[in-house]
């Protein structure tokens, strides 16, 4: 379905508006975080000791690296790279119906040609 000029224009104008308002939005968000952050930090400091952010980042990076090593996904889906079919004969989710139909027809044409060749070869041998 084609995109109308109106929708293209509206999208363009929204993008320009976002560019124009981005600095204001950023400063507003920063001010909100600054106000709320100070209040929370004061409450936390009364209860417990606060660690500097650099130490926290280093520790979390080490923990994240360890977790990623352990979490390797095992995919049970095995695909034929040439036909893109999996072991159950299903195409990938991202492939649209027209592509699926086209590939299926192409595959059937190849099967038909091989059957015809086999029939001709068999006829040639029988006489």
From Swiss-Prot:
Sequence ranges of Basic residues compositional bias: 1-21, 98-120
Chief localisation class: nucleus
Subunit record text: Interacts with CTCF, MYO1C and with the transcriptional machinery, including RNA polymerase II and TBP.
Region (Disordered): 1-24, 98-127
Superkingdom, natural source: Eukaryota
Biological function: In hippocampal neurons, regulates dendritic and spine growth and synaptic transmission.
Pfam families membership: LLPH (PF10169)
Subcellular location: Nucleus, Nucleolus; Chromosome
Keyword Protein biosynthesis carried by entry: no
Family (UniProt): Belongs to the learning-associated protein family.
Protein name: Protein LLP homolog
Gene Ontology MF terms in the entry: basal RNA polymerase II transcription machinery binding
Record-listed cross-link Glycyl lysine isopeptide (Lys-Gly) (interchain with G-Cter in SUMO2), residues: 65, 72
Any one Gene Ontology BP term: dendrite extension
Keywords: Chromosome, Isopeptide bond, Nucleus, Ubl conjugation
One GO CC term, this protein: nucleolus
Entries under InterPro entries matching the protein: LLPH-like
